[in-house]
A protein has these predicted regions:
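Extracellular/periplasmic, surface-exposed regions of secreted and cell-surface proteins
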Residues: 1-180
């Protein structure tokens, strides 16, 4: 068993030169229990299948306009009062935020390896899966900048996160017939 697929996604949340990305995936399976050499063992093991898969997806959920140099408007209590008299506060705009012009998709790669076993004519089934998920290019603050600059570091695709785990399922599916 073999399956391959791919996605070509675009998002307006990124600069035009990084808007589009390709995300491939595939899986392979081998049902050993259907092979001729395994037939003698089917008395003990009704089903034996090995599985593996790998896939990459993209994450565009980074916030709006993260790649544009925008200025923040301060109003109300955050306005300045030293320009006028009394309790009057005036709106003002802050310094443009720093941006990374190469901001792009976070990519999430998942690897999965598994085995399916069936016993007692598939009344008892055991499934085991091991997986690893790695997120590359996570949005994170960039290198620290001198405080005299007056702006915080631009966010960039600098982070990585890896999770690993396993899953074991055991189930019994016997059908009892009415004795009447």
């Amino acid at each position: 068993l073999l399956e391959l697929s791919g996605r070509y996604d675009g998002s307006s949340k990124f600069p035009s030169h990084t808007q589009w990305a390709f995300f491939p995936s595939g899986s392979v399976g081998y049902r050993i229990s259907e092979e001729a050499y395994f037939q003698e063992a089917k008395e003990y093991v009704s089903n034996l299948k090995l599985r593996a898969s790998y896939g990459v997806i993209g994450n565009q959920e980074i916030g709006a306009n993260m790649f544009l140099e925008t200025m923040t408007k301060y109003t109300g209590d955050k306005g300045v009062s030293w320009l006028g008299s009394g309790d009057v506060r005036y709106d003002y705009f802050g310094q443009p935020k720093m941006v990374d012009p190469s901001l792009t998709w976070e990519s999430i790669a998942t690897t999965n390896v598994g085995i399916d076993l069936g016993f007692l004519n598939n009344d008892l089934n055991v499934n085991f899966d091991w997986y690893q998920r790695t997120t590359n290019g996570m949005l994170a603050p960039g290198k620290e900048l001198p405080s005299v600059l007056g702006a915080s570091a631009a966010y960039e695709n600098a982070g990585q996160l890896r999770t690993r785990g396993w899953e074991l399922n055991i189930d019994w599916r016997h059908v009892f017939h009415d004795a009447g």
